[in-house]
Amino acid sequence: MEVGGDTAAPAPGGAEDLEDTQFPSEEAREGGGVHAVPPDPEDEGLEETGSKDKDQPPSPSPPPQSEALSSTSRLWSPAAPENSPTCSPESSSGGQGGDPSDEEWRSQRKHVFVLSEAGKPIYSRYGSVEALSATMGVMTALVSFVQSAGDAIRAIYAEDHKLVFLQQGPLLLVAMSRTSQSAAQLRGELLAVHAQIVSTLTRASVARIFAHKQNYDLRRLLAGSERTLDRLLDSMEQDPGALLLGAVRCVPLARPLRDALGALLRRCTAPGLALSVLAVGGRLITAAQERNVLAECRLDPADLQLLLDWVGAPAFAAGEAWAPVCLPRFNPDGFFYAYVARLDAMPVCLLLLGTQREAFHAMAACRRLVEDGMHALGAMRALGEAASFSNASSASAPAYSVQAVGAPGLRHFLYKPLDIPDHHRQLPQFTSPELEAPYSREEERQRLSDLYHRLHARLHSTSRPLRLIYHVAEKETLLAWVTSKFELYTCLSPLVTKAGAILVVTKLLRWVKKEEDRLFIRYPPKYSTPPATSTDQAAHNGLFTGL
């Protein structure tokens, strides 16, 4: 535990006035997000301080011990369904070549394994799956032994290690960690890994494959996906905001320009077009959805984050691409057809998601209209300044400096508005500044990520949820606060007192309120597309299967 311990903090003075305000809503495919699964009651390695409050948003209860977790989560990169060409040309070695006896392998803070019910290795975060086949066999034996007694194994705790299991259909996912993450947070990462696999093959294809042959080697169909999974896990550890908050991050942009870009997307329609997205560096500029296609089945932020990570990959650094995409939250058994293109040789990326296989040329025509419209608006220069194109090829492209808040002592923060109109819930969003000194080095960013995970687990504890946490660590002070209107995590200088922290947070909330039109998409645009030219397209593409 960090030096100084934790002390309960009262609600900041003047907080009620602030709460009355409305807060609307290299290669990368990392991510984004669903609400993390709430911590298990057993996860109480840290002393909890603070008090319950009726303003605390409800936290869902964990599933029963024998219940299989079936939901999927945000932060994946899609590819093609079975027997369809994949979008990414990458191939990967599947990590380091060590085994459990290798010191370098044992020194890793966290391992993730994927294997089939029959014990067939599929993926390992570190080390080759061949060298780890015996280890994965032991995992399969543990799961089978518990299942034979009519139960399901969820987690094993051993000193400072956690071993978390997740059964998803014919696949078994295991996380072994000595980080400060709770079992529930590790389970959320496993759900993200599973969703990555589903987005590549679709859930129905995976089930059909193993129903036909239980010991099938799924790596044949996932060739090249190992590095994608590696990047996914790296991004969740280094930039946990999207996963913890279940939201997407937008590029800060003046509202008139963002509205003009949204109107431009609304005017560019094609038969079967369901969703149009403008993004840069894995962050959202604006998006427009078709009224009818997504009216009853809203696009989950996890699926949107999936798309943002996907279009930010180096595979789409130039030119245009056309590929099928499975969105596991929308329909894990079906897929869309996606048109992806870089605009005017800039990092700005256009994504058009449709339901018709033969719509490539219609989508390409939309791309030309969008390019012409953006030049007419002078949007490229504004987007270049807003998104810092010098580093926009990565998903961690800087958006703005924490110095813009004008609150001395504030180092970093994560902010998600909660009290937003219903039509904004289609697009949960959060904002955070770029990480600057003293969090320039990877180990420092990792340490800050651990602190955010720890605070999140305690705020959303199922046994004793907290509303406000003031935590004094060795190198920084942190304040986490959740109300009915927002969820906030702040990192402050270690010299900031409790009273000073309250003043900094109050100033931050006022700044966010002032800048909300620039930080968030407050009015997501909608449009209607022309009728489809073929009556059998919906049945063919499987988009609405199971809805």
Curated annotation (Swiss-Prot):
GO terms for cellular component: cytoplasm; Mon1-Ccz1 complex. Keywords: Acetylation, Phosphoprotein. It comes from the Eukaryota. Induction: Induced in fibroblast KMB17 cells by HSV-1. It holds the Pfam family Fuz_longin_1. The modification N-acetylmethionine is found at M1. Residues 1-106 are annotated as: Disordered. Residues 1-15 have a biased composition (Low complexity). The modification Phosphoserine is found at S59, S61. GO terms for biological process: early viral transcription; late viral transcription; protein targeting to vacuole; vesicle-mediated transport. Interacts with CCNT2; down-regulates CCNT2-mediated activation of viral promoters during herpes simplex virus 1/HHV-1 infection. Found in a complex with RMC1, CCZ1 MON1A and MON1B. Belongs to the MON1/SAND family. This is Vacuolar fusion protein MON1 homolog B. It comes from Homo sapiens (Human).
